Amino acid sequence: MTNQNRQKLHRLPLGDIRAAGWLGEQLRRNIAGMGGHLHELEPGMIATPYTTRETYEGWGRDRAPGWGAEISGNYWWGFIELAFTSGDPDMIDRAHAWANAVLANRREDGYLGTYREGDDFFDDYNAWGTSCGMNALLAYYDATGRQDVLEAVHGCMLWFCDNWSGDKKTRYAGMTIVECMTRVYGLTGDERLMQFCCSYFDFIERNDLFDGSLSAFLSPELHYNSTHGSLYANEIDRPALMYACGADETYLEASLNAYRKGKEKALLPNGGITCESEYLAPVGCVVETEYCAITFYNKSLANLAQITGEPYFADDMEQTVFNAAEGARKKDERAIAYLTAPNQIMASSTSSYANEGHQVYAPCVPVACCPVNSVRVLPEFLRNTALEGEDGLYFSTYAPCIVNYRGMKITLETDYPFRETLTFRFEKVGETAVSLTCRFRIPAWCDSPRAVLNGEEIALSSDGYAKVAHAFSDGDVFVLTLPMQVRIYEMQDDDRLSMHPLSVFRGPLLYSLPVPEIWQGWPGHSATPLPEGWQWYNVHPVIPPSGLDVYDDMGMRRRLITWNAALAEGLSADEITVTDNGADGYPWENSPISLSVPGYRAPYSYAPYPQKTLDPYVQNGYAYVDEEMPLTLIPYGCTALRISCFPKAKAEMVNKLKGDN
C-alpha cells in the first residue's frame, strides 16, 4: 500500500487553538474539577497504570490491566488536550511528567502498555486499552514535537505487529488499535503498520462477532444489540482512516454507510448514539446514551470531517457536543452522568434502566470509562474549530477561541451556539505573518447567512464551506451571522413505539422543558472513598405540595407536575417565540435564550409516582390533553432533568381547547 494522506483537511498542532469566552470558562472549571483531579481521586484506576503498571485490583486480575489501560489512557488523552487547549501551565507540567514516566516504564521489547508478566497479553483489552494510552502520547507529541515520544509509540505498535501477527487477534474492541496504527503510519510511513491493519480487517471479515467487519459496515442493515453503542460510535471512522492512508474507496464508503445508517436508526435528538443497557437500540424518548459514546462519536465525526472535507460532519459534532455532552455535566464540572436520555425526570442511583448508579451524577464510578471521556470531549471539539486545507484555513465547528496560524492570531468572539453572531478578528503576531485565505462553514440549518468584512456587507454562499474572496491580514474584522430558525423535528421511532414525538431545535441546540431539580449529595460508591468537596448526586424533580390529604394528593399530582406536556400535531415554527433575556455570564448555568412554545397539558401521559422515567402514554398515537399549557423551553445542555421529546396532541382536540378559550 502506497503511503499517502488523502485527508482533505488537517488539524493544527495541539495548542495552536486556545479556548476563550464561555468555553474558556468551562475548561477552567473542568481543570478545577474532574479534568484536573480524576487521577488523584482514583490513582490505581487512572494515575499509575502506564507509569508503574499498578492498576486497581478490585476489578480482578483478569480485567485490571485492560480496564486500567483504557480508562487511564483515555483520561491522559483528554488531560493532555485539556492542558494545551487551555494553556494552563500547571496542567502542561503534569502532562510532561506523565509522558516522561510512561517512557521510563517502556520494556526492552518496546511494549508500553499496562500488562505485566503473568497477564494475558492476547487479551482483547491489551490492544484496545493500549491504543488509548498511545493516542494520549501522540497528542503529547502533537503539542511538543518530541521525537522520542513518537519513536516510543512507533515501537509499541511494532510490538503488536510482531506479537499479534496472523490470526492472533481478538474480535471485540481490539481492532480499535487500527486508529493508532494509521496515525503512526501517517507519521512514519512504516508499511508494517498498514500490513497489520489489513490483516486485522481480514481476520474480522472471517471471524465477525459484533458486526465490525467491512461487509457489515457496507450492509444496509443495522442490527440492534449487535454491539456496544459506544463501540459503534468509536469505530465508524475506522475504514475511512484506512482509506486516508491509501486503501481503496470501498473503505471510505464503508464508513460513510455506517455513519448514515447509524444516524437514521440509532441517533437520538440530543446527538447521542443509543446505548440501551449499553448496546445499540432503536431510538425513543427515554433511551439512554453513554458518555463514552458521546466522546467517541464526536471523535469519529471529526475524523470523517477531516478525511472527506464535508461540512455536515461538523453540523453533527455541534449537535452531539452542545446537547448530549453538555446535558450530562454538572455545571461546576465536578460530576457527570454515565447514562442520560432526552426525557429524564430523575437522575439517581436507581433511575437507570441499565444498571444501578448509571444515571447518578458522580465524579468517578467503579468503572470510570465515562468520567475520563468527559474530560476529552470539549478539547477535542475545540481542536476542530479551525482546520488547514490546501487552499487555506477552514473554520469548521464554532465556539469562542483564539487560533494561531502562520504568524496570525485570529480571535473568534461569539456567544454561539446561543446567539447568531460570530466575530473574527485578525491580528499579526509574527514577522513571518502571511495573508490568509479562509472558508467558513455554513450549517445545513442556516439558509440565509450574512457577512460583513471591515464594515461592508459582502456576498456569501449559503451552504458548505463559504469562501470569502479576500486575503485576510492584520486588522481585518469579519462578522458572520448565522440566523437560527426554529425547527420542529419528528422522531422516527417506528422500530419502537411509532409515537413520532416532537422536538424543538434552534440552530444547533435542542430545546427542552426543564423539570425543576433538587440535587442531593451523598458519599456514593466510588472504588476509593471521595475526599472532602467531592460527592455523588441524586437529582430528583420538585413537585409542588397539594395541601390535600394523602389520598387526594395522589389524584392531584397529575395536575401539579410541570412536565406533563404535549405539543400539537402540525405545530409550526412560526408559533414559537424566541426570547433573548440579555443574560451574560456562564451560559450553561443561565441561558441567554429561551423559547415560548404553545403546549397542552397531558394529565394522563406521565406516571404520577414513577421510579424511572417512562415513555409518555398515548392512545392511538396521541396524548389526551385538557387545557392549554404555555411552555418555556431552554437549551438541553442547561438541564439535568427535562422533557425533550413531546407526545402529539390531535389537531381537533387542540382546536376545541382553543375554541373554548
Regions found by a protein language model. Name each.
Residues 2-89, 121-143, 174-192, 196, ...:
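Aromatic (Trp/Tyr) and acidic
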Residues 197, 255, 315-323, 328-420, ...:
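C-terminal beta-rich recognition modules with glycine/proline-rich loops and embedded aromatic residues
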Residues 439-467, 471, 480, 487:
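Accessory beta-strand-rich segments of carbohydrate-active enzymes
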Residues 103-104, 158-162, 202-206, 244, ...:
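Amphipathic alpha-helical segments of tetratricopeptide repeats
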Residues 118-127, 134, 149-172:
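Asp-box/WD-like beta-propeller blade repeats and closely related beta-sheet repeat scaffolds
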Residues 169, 208-228:
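A surface-exposed regulatory interaction patch that couples sensing to output
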